[in-house]
From Swiss-Prot:
CDD domains in the cross-refs: PAL-HAL
Pathway(s) annotated for this protein in UniProt: Amino-acid degradation; L-histidine degradation into L-glutamate; N-formimidoyl-L-glutamate from L-histidine: step 1/3
Similarity comment: family membership: Belongs to the PAL/histidase family.
Organism: Pseudomonas putida (strain ATCC 47054 / DSM 6125 / CFBP 8728 / NCIMB 11950 / KT2440)
GO biological process: L-histidine catabolic process to glutamate and formamide; L-histidine catabolic process to glutamate and formate
Chief subcellular location: cytoplasm
HAMAP family assigned to the protein according to its UniProt record, in alphabetical order: His_ammonia_lyase (MF_00229)
Keywords assigned: Cytoplasm, Histidine metabolism, Lyase
Catalytic activity reported: L-histidine = trans-urocanate + NH4(+)
Domain of life: Bacteria
Modified how: Contains an active site 4-methylidene-imidazol-5-one (MIO), which is formed autocatalytically by cyclization and dehydration of residues Ala-Ser-Gly.
Name assigned to this protein: Histidine ammonia-lyase
One protein family per Pfam: Lyase_aromatic
Gene: hutH
One Gene Ontology CC term in the entry: cytoplasm
Amino acid sequence: MTELTLKPGTLTLAQLRAIHAAPVRLQLDASAAPAIDASVACVEQIIAEDRTAYGINTGFGLLASTRIASHDLENLQRSLVLSHAAGIGAPLDDDLVRLIMVLKINSLSRGFSGIRRKVIDALIALVNAEVYPHIPLKGSVGASGDLAPLAHMSLVLLGEGKARYKGQWLPATEALAIAGLEPLTLAAKEGLALLNGTQASTAYALRGLFQAEDLYAAAIACGGLSVEAALGSRSPFDARVHEVRGQRGQIDTAACFRDLLGDSSEVSLSHKNCDKVQDPYSLRCQPQVMGACLTQLRQAAEVLGIEANAVSDNPLVFAAEGDVISGGNFHAEPVAMAADNLALAIAEIGSLSERRISLMMDKHMSQLPPFLVENGGVNSGFMIAQVTAAALASENKALSHPHSVDSLPTSANQEDHVSMAPAAGKRLWEMAENTRGVLAIEWLGACQGLDLRKGLKTSAKLEQARQALRSEVPHYDRDRFFAPDIEKAVDLLAKGSLTGLLPAGVLPSL
């Protein structure tokens, strides 16, 4: 199990990827305590002085002008959590819940939320015990924060709701006991601090980012294999071509292709003196298209890395000045826009891959047997696999429609503009699944094409990619049940089997 000492506000993308991938044992850095305690003291002073402060001794949303009596403050926080736990849909998996919880711990621990260490420690104990609250997938519009998902997360702290432990659902009180905890009574401001924030939206988008990174790496490897299978040229990857344009993503992508393709191979030498002048765009323009995708990944990663370390609570407690300020950091518009940009990249990765599949199957373009199979007519080969790839790529065109431009007023028009960041993030997973399927078919097709080059080898790194597939899926010598081959290739890609072929430092979290 990964051990992490959390210094609030310093989580890296690599750490976030690791937290999403596997259980973690978390410890809060001792340096966090003074700021946390100071924010709590500030809230307590406001109550003692009987000052009005939103979320501490008032109602919420449109009810913000309703003053709450001191004897009702604890009940106010409990009622908030119970009433806001109104999500719907399938429960989030453990990996995503863990990431949401760590993001919330990270935010609360920065000391601007007025929440006691006791509550933060309880969340840490749940993470360390691998006790994951039941959080439904749907119910947040990404402003005012992710209220419903985070309310479901917080229910367990109160002894309400349920949690999953080692794959089994348990009542909250039993789940708390496993973590060595008892139900908490929330103090003033604490329920709101737990519920308000962009942590679910950010986790949704981070998962999409991590998946998109793996897809980018797989597409570079599969695209390189396709260049070789279709007897493409290495010239379009020449560094000089890309330096004069100056687009960093394009420059770095071309370098990745040069690293994978090498200077030459048996395949490239076999057509050294051919009369082809230029390759089709799906081969030749890979650095330009995939470079643009890499730029989107990097820009989204920057936004999400900042948001993962942000304080997105409301109101914020500035203990040094004794101020409590209502703002709008809960509005997840930056996350929604980042997710929209990731959607464009995921869609384009799949779209370009599908075109390379089609190219390889066309004997006039690739000089390979029609549909990548010998004895065509009797055998249909990759004919319908390409149709599947086309269907998946087309689905992603619709799914890539931006969500950040959508809004629907809530809370009686008090919350009159929202981000739709959760929807923007979660559709990335379906898009990634679609593009993974397209890339799996290209991987199969490119390796098939190379097999049909009668024993010629490609570069050392691309041979690794080829053998990674051939260790699971044999050559397609005659028609057979095709779907299992695609499923095996998809499974390999989902495990990141081709991600390690890229040079270090290209992708934001790797």
